[in-house]
Amino acid sequence: MVVLPLFFAFFFMVQGNNYQPRDEIPYVRKYFYVGGQYADDGNGDHIFRDQMYVEHLVPTKGPIKQQPIVLLHGQAQTGTNWLNKPDGGRGWASYFIEHGYECYIVDQTSRGRSPWVPENGTIAAIPAETIQRLFTATARYKLWPEAELHTQWPGSGVIGDPIFDAYYASTVQFLKSQIQQETTIQAAGAALLDRIGRPVILVTHSQAGAHGWLVADTRPELVHSIIALEPAGPPFENVIYKGPYSRVWGLTNAPLTYSPAVVDPETEIVKQTIDDRPGSHCIIQADSPPPRQLPNLRRIRTLVVTAEASFHRPTDWCVVRYMEQAGISVDHVQLGDIGIRGNGHMLFLERNSDEIAAVLRRWMEEKDTKPAKKAQEAQGAQGAQEAQGKEKEL
């Protein structure tokens, strides 16, 4: 069935700004769940846990691009990040559908429409003031050198501003355990790629950067490329988010496949600290013994995108350096360096989000020379497969 995205969600909160939304892009929408398993509830009955909600959006005339896009949101967010923006504007799902891509949008396990049960572990929420400081009003707080360059968030970015309130109302609880979140996403994400059955483009944001590496590590043959928007980092430590030693596997908290193999990352991954950039150190692998490689990620084309004013600006270079050291071919686009100014961590929700999406699209398409006909044939084969499954059409 053809539907129009509900871009009027929260519209009552922003109508005082006289925002005039553009017409949305029509698409065919389906949803389904992947992963998970039955578990004993402790009373002799069973519950289903660790499943992941997936929303599948397809251009009404069918996709004309070879690879589907799988969009993975960050911490305290849901898949609504990719639909419409809190100011009422079109989101990235509409942008990519308009350009011929089919999109799969997930809610992380134990998040949003992916049910949480007590057995999944303790949950937490991000206070509005933290969102202001790190995402939406960074110029007010100046917690890192580039923070004052932030100009692209619509509105003031603080409590009481209707656009901020609309955005903050969309944030949700999340699992406190990063390992629990990563391992359940890894399993559910692998199940999603198995269901799609052909190589995809993973677009990850923030916390989901780790999820993308893990899913690709599990199903490298089903990942065409990865676009990591300000991925979780830097390796082995937290900088802005102060806390305990983190990402003991370098890019993740959960195990990755290294060569030579690693059992105990804290002792087997030998580290060094470098200070290649003023005011920003970086922990990477030591030069001796030779750095361990990430063989399942080496063949996957990867793009890391960093916004000019984000708290990732001082540290994303370190993530890229670690990846290169582990044998991954990675492109790093710093938006400020190509004339896209003023963006923060939530760059896909900001005023110039389409301009940034165009950068991603050009990168995707310059590497993809396969004819569109094959995409349509693959879509037809997938449709026949889905008709036999439990997918529910809205």
UniProtKB/Swiss-Prot annotation:
Keyword check for Transmembrane: no
Signal peptide: 1-16
Biased segments, Low complexity type: 377-387
Enzyme class: hydrolase
EC number: 3.1.1.1
Glycosylation sites: N120
InterPro entries assigned to the protein according to its UniProt record, in alphabetical order: AB_hydrolase_1, AB_hydrolase_fold, Carboxylesterase_BioH
Any GO molecular function: carboxylesterase activity
SUPFAM superfamilies to which the protein is assigned, alphabetical: alpha/beta-Hydrolases
Region (Disordered): 366-394
Biased composition (Basic and acidic residues): 366-376
Alphabetic keyword roster: Glycoprotein, Hydrolase, Lipid degradation, Lipid metabolism, Secreted, Serine esterase, Signal
Active site, UniProt feature: S206 (nucleophile)
Coiled coil: none
Residues passing through the membrane, by range: none
Gene Ontology BP annotations: lipid catabolic process
Catalyzed reactions per annotation: a carboxylic ester + H2O = an alcohol + a carboxylate + H(+)
Pfam families linked to this entry: Abhydrolase_6
Location of this chain's protein in the cell: Secreted
GO cellular component: extracellular region
Role: Lipase that displays broad substrate specificity.
Similarity comment: family membership: Belongs to the AB hydrolase superfamily.
Protein name as it appears in the record: Probable secreted lipase ARB_00047
Organism this protein belongs to: Arthroderma benhamiae (strain ATCC MYA-4681 / CBS 112371)
